[in-house]
Structures are given as structure tokens and as C-alpha cells.
Amino acid sequence: MKFFIDTADVGEIKKALALGLCDGVTTNPSLVAKTGRGFEDVLKEIVQLVPGPISAEVTATDYEGMLREGRHYAKFGSQVVIKVPLTVDGLRAVKTLTDEGTKVNVTLCFSPVQALLAAKAGATYISPFVGRLDDISQDGMAMVADIVQIYRNYGFKTQVLVASVRHPVHVLEAAKLGADVATIPYSVIEQLAKHPLTDAGLKKFLADWEKVPKAPK
């Protein structure tokens, strides 16, 4: 399973790259707003850093606007993937952009049937939002399981990109279900590396090492 980092913070991207845990990047307007920078400046910098897929989200909600923004952002680099919402106009934009050779990530997916439509339209990625479904007492990972099964049933090439990841269990379940990608906040990447028994074991090893006779200097 590939790891994308879900951020527009260049510092976090650099840290994930140094760990070998950044196969790609996903951004959205909310993440860009947190940086206090203009989106195009951020995108240009990310393109210089990351060789893998970089999702750049349109803010237009109409078909023509999505095409205009998508075509513009696609010029920033061959690794740029245009991110569009799962709406009727969004699906239409997916079809057009895909026919033009542009990769598309369909975002804000909350049902397996929506994911089926995105695959039929030719999406490169589908982004089911597991955390937001969990927030309203629905089962986000059950949605992912259904999407993975449907795509396998019919041989769709669209990759399942699990989004709205809130904690390590989401990552674990995505991997168990066979999702292609999980896009993960840097804070969750750090949590993945942590375990209390690892900390306790390291503390014990270091304490025991202090008891080992040392050669005179």
C-alpha cells in the first residue's frame, strides 16, 4: 500500500520524504488555508520536492470552471493529479480531463455507489472519506471494503485512496482491505511508529547497557 501525505505544509512533506514515507501528496483548500500562503506558490514548491502524484483540488463547482482550473494546474507538472468533487458536474469533468490525458482524483466520496460512478467515468483515484463517515456514526471502513470488492468484481483500474484518516487503526484496516493508497496526516504517520512496548523495551535495553562493564578509555 502506498502512503501519501495529506498536507500542504512543505516542512511536513520534507520530513515524510526523509522517512521514505511519502509516495505522493494530497492537498485541499482547507489544508492550503492553514499555510497562509497562495495555493499556486505552494503547489510549485511541492512539485519541485515530490516525484510522485500530487493532488491539486479545484474550487470551482461547475463543469466549465473545473475544466479551466484543472487544465491550469495540470501544467504545473506531470505528477499533478486534478482533484474534483463527486458531483454530477465533477463526474463530467472527470470524463473530459481523463480523455485529455489528465489524471483525476475524485474526492468527497461517501458511498460505494458514488465510487462506482467515479470508476465508470475513468477516475485515476477515488477518495472515500472514512473519518467523516465515522463522525456521523457510520462505518467508514465498511464503505472502503465495498468499494474494493466492487472494483475487483469488474476489473476497474481506479485506485482506492483512503482519505480522512484520523488514527493508525484507519491505516491498518485500509491495508488489510487491500486499498491502493492511504493519505495520512503527518501527525498520524508519527503515531504509526509509536508503541509503548517499544519505548519500554528501549528504556530497559539502555538501563541494562549501563550495567555492562566498559573498557577503560
From Swiss-Prot:
Which GO cellular component terms, listed alphabetically, does the Swiss-Prot or TrEMBL entry include? cytoplasm
Enzyme Commission number, as recorded: 2.2.1.2
Q: What class of enzyme is it?
A: transferase
Q: What is its main location?
A: cytoplasm
In which compartments does the protein localize? Cytoplasm
Q: Which residues form the active site?
A: 83
What metabolic or biological pathway is this protein involved in?
A: Carbohydrate degradation; pentose phosphate pathway; D-glyceraldehyde 3-phosphate and beta-D-fructose 6-phosphate from D-ribose 5-phosphate and D-xylulose 5-phosphate (non-oxidative stage): step 2/3
* GO BP field: carbohydrate metabolic process; pentose-phosphate shunt
Q: Does the keyword Transferase apply?
A: yes
List keywords of the entry alphabetically: Cytoplasm, Pentose shunt, Schiff base, Transferase
Keyword Ribonucleoprotein, does the record have it?
no
Q: InterPro entries given for it? A: Aldolase_TIM, TAL/FSA, Transaldolase_3B, Transaldolase_3B/F6P_aldolase, Transaldolase_AS, TSA/FSA_arc/bac
By sequence similarity, the record places it as follows: Belongs to the transaldolase family. Type 3B subfamily.
Summarize the protein's role. Transaldolase is important for the balance of metabolites in the pentose-phosphate pathway.
Check the record and name the HAMAP family matching this protein: Transaldolase_3b
What is the protein's name according to its record? Probable transaldolase
Q: What gene makes this protein?
A: tal
